[in-house]
Amino acid sequence: MASSQLDRQRSRSAKMNRALTAAEWWRLGLMFAVIVALHLVGWLTVTLLVEPARLSLGGKAFGIGVGLTAYTLGLRHAFDADHIAAIDNTTRKLMSDGHRPLAVGFFFSLGHSTVVFGLAVMLVTGLKAIVGPVENDSSTLHHYTGLIGTSISGAFLYLIGILNVIVLVGIVRVFAHLRRGDYDEAELEQQLDNRGLLIRFLGRFTKSLTKSWHMYPVGFLFGLGFDTATEIALLVLAGTSAAAGLPWYAILCLPVLFAAGMCLLDTIDGSFMNFAYGWAFSSPVRKIYYNITVTGLSVAVALLIGSVELLGLIANQLGWQGPFWDWLGGLDLNTVGFVVVAMFALTWAIALLVWHYGRVEERWTPAPDRTT
């Protein structure tokens, strides 16, 4: 039993650490082809159609500058802390299940961008009734979409945080047994794989996230807050004339550019974390060492950002005021997102340095049984 478990684990590790297959290269190529297409459609529309038309919005030129603003908003929003936490933690979960999820960030950002694009399409098709509510922070539409989006985002991050807490406790227990020499390699692998407590509580949800594309609806739900949609809509609707005089292609190029920027960086983030975790899953000792560090960081990030979102939502709904609540409400999640990305990259780099110079694998790998 233990031998077959170890054989399955070695097969899984070999699968994750081998070179990309032709099918995986094909999927990566399709992802980046979509990203390139978004860039081409967005920028060619701006440069070849919008800019030569000399359109104006609120007395100001509507051209490359506005397109660059939309693109920059997409790049910036890719570093939102909730994006980083959701993508990186889901990558961990799928890799621990034996998958190689190359497109988690890609599908998450596509789902998020769909909300923005859908709003723009409604504007183009004449549903001007949503213009005022989307522009107005105190409107009922803005209120309830923000409530729904933030609640889903915070709850998802807490769910991911709980998942990682349970995983972390199990890994620490395995590590303690390893240091005492109580288990051989096969038993250690069995302990790492027997993390079924989470399934008892969150089985349906965790089982549903088995493919990278499952992050598309998650990204869509995250986008229901209309925070980013409002940024794009305000670009189009600013001024008293709103979007009344603009052609459809001028309006739709903005969410396309927004999606291009966000998809690019979210895809790079997901791919980077995929290969970083791939190194960690190649042997039992690496899994223990790396996962204690990174899972602890994942727990901290998910629970921190989830707490900020949910506490801010509760304080806003209940009208709580004071120095702490004012500080909490003023936190910039974009800045936090950049910090989170740096923390993940730095943790990976430090883990590799300590691994190399501390001879961790040599010191922690159980000695082979010499009686057989």
Swiss-Prot record:
Pfam family, one: NicO
Membrane topology, from the record: Multi-pass membrane protein
Superkingdom of this protein's organism: Bacteria
Effect of D227I: 92% decrease of nickel uptake. Decreases or abolishes resistance against several antibiotics
Localisation: Cell membrane
Bilayer-crossing regions: 30-50, 55-75, 104-124, 152-172, 218-238, 245-265, 294-314, 335-355
Catalyses which reaction(s): Ni(2+)(in) = Ni(2+)(out)
BP terms from Gene Ontology: nickel cation import across plasma membrane; response to antibiotic
Alphabetically ordered keywords of this record: Antibiotic resistance, Cell membrane, Ion transport, Membrane, Nickel, Nickel transport, Transmembrane, Transmembrane helix, Transport
GO-annotated molecular function: high-affinity nickel cation transmembrane transporter activity
GO cellular component terms listed in the entry, alphabetical order: plasma membrane
Main location: membrane
Activation/inhibition comment: Export of the fluoroquinolone antibiotic norfloxacin is inhibited by the proton ionophore carbonyl cyanide m-chlorophenylhydrazone (CCCP). Nickel may influence the extrusion of antibiotics possibly by facilitating the proton motive force-dependent efflux process.
General function of this protein: Involved in nickel uptake. In addition, acts as a drug efflux pump and contributes to moderate tolerance towards different classes of antibiotics, including fluoroquinolones, aminoglycosides and the anti-TB drug isoniazid, with a preference for fluoroquinolones. The drug efflux function is probably dependent on proton motive force (pmf) or ion gradient, and might be facilitated by the presence of Ni(2+) ions.
Family: Belongs to the NiCoT transporter (TC 2.A.52) family.
Other known facts: Overexpression of NicT in E.coli and M.smegmatis enhances tolerance towards several antibiotics (norfloxacin, sparfloxacin, ofloxacin, gentamicin, nalidixic acid and isoniazid).
Protein name stated in the entry: Nickel transporter NicT
Source species: Mycobacterium tuberculosis (strain ATCC 25618 / H37Rv)
Gene behind the chain: nicT
